[in-house]
């Protein structure tokens, strides 16, 4: 049996409050809206009761933020791509921001189990003046549990149309890609955090974002396998390779906190679900 599910979450600004409305079909839900930072920023948690995707499953997620709204979206646990008998599993996420909107897309990691045939697509569309901080974390197998990513493949697609595109196909049997210094160098977690804007960032603001990120990286244990870059005037990215998810996620959270303060003058308020 396969699952096909959709979820649409819309943030709107009503007076001084960001309000969330959602629609769904299939096993995708949004938990109660929370306001740990006050009415202006709405925190939401996506729940997928089946707990993972197998071959033939499709999840479609669409999030919009209206002018002046600020939403933060996360998950209570990893997205798990399990073994497939032939059909691929697909998760598609689209983030659309109107002028002046802000969004934080902070899901926990995706785990690729051996034998999976999976694709994870993220598309971001931002109007002028909109800004977004998001991340993407992928683990290949569960090394700590002696469950390697021995066969199967994973396709990743991250795009801001006309501005930035990253696409990769990670095949478990591609030893050059998985283990050589030209690829993952034997690491089994790849992660990135990105700040994207709907219009060109001022040069000084963009450089400061790079400097802030590099300062965080230099103080972290993963500094040898992490780096910050700006592939476009609207995008700043930190990429990292790690043996496990936890150290990579720690680095991403530190960069997120630093960027939140730098770009938005907002102290970081960790989503409550992360401490459960």
UniProtKB/Swiss-Prot annotation:
From the UniProt record, which GO molecular function terms apply?
nickel cation binding
Keywords for the protein's UniProt record, in alphabetical order: Chaperone, Cytoplasm, Nickel insertion
Can you cite an annotated GO cellular component? cytoplasm
State the Pfam families in the record.
UreD
Q: Where in the cell is it found?
A: Cytoplasm
Q: Mind telling me which InterPro entries this protein's record contains?
A: UreD
Q: What is its main location?
A: cytoplasm
Functional note? Required for maturation of urease via the functional incorporation of the urease nickel metallocenter.
Q: How does it assemble?
A: UreD, UreF and UreG form a complex that acts as a GTP-hydrolysis-dependent molecular chaperone, activating the urease apoprotein by helping to assemble the nickel containing metallocenter of UreC. The UreE protein probably delivers the nickel.
Give the family this protein belongs to, as stated in its UniProt record. Belongs to the UreD family.
Would you tell me the protein name for this molecule?
Urease accessory protein UreD
Write down the species.
Answer: Polaromonas naphthalenivorans (strain CJ2)
């Amino acid at each position: 049996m396969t699952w096909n599910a959709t979820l649409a979450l819309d943030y709107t600004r009503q007076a001084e409050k960001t309000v969330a409305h959602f629609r769904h079909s299939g096993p995708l839900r949004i938990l109660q809206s929370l306001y740990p930072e006050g009415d202006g920023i709405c925190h939401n948690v996506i729940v997928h009761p089946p707990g993972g995707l197998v071959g033939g499953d499709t999840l479609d997620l669409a999030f919009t933020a209206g002018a002046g709204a600020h939403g933060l979206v996360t998950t209570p646990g990893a997205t798990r791509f399990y073994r497939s008998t032939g059909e691929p599993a697909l998760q598609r996420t689209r983030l659309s921001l109107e002028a002046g909107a802000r969004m934080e897309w902070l899901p926990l990691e995706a785990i690729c189990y051996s034998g999976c045939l999976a694709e994870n697509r993220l598309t971001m569309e931002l109007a002028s003046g909109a800004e977004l901080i998001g991340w993407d974390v992928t683990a290949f197998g569960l090394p700590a549990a002696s469950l390697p990513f021995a066969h199967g493949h994973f396709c990743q697609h991250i795009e801001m149309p006309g501005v930035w595109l990253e696409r990769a196909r990670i095949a478990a049997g591609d030893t050059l890609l998985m283990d050589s210094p030209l690829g993952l160098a034997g690491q089994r977690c790849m992660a990135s955090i990105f700040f994207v804007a709907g219009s060109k960032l001022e040069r000084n603001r963009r450089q400061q974002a790079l400097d802030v990120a590099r300062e965080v990286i230099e103080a972290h244990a993963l500094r040898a396998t992490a780096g910050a870059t700006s592939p476009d005037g609207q995008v700043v990215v930190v990429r990292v390779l790690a043996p496990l998810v936890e150290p990579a996620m720690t680095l991403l959270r530190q960069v997120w906190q630093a960027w939140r303060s730098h770009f938005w003058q907002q102290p970081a308020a960790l989503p409550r679900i992360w401490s459960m």
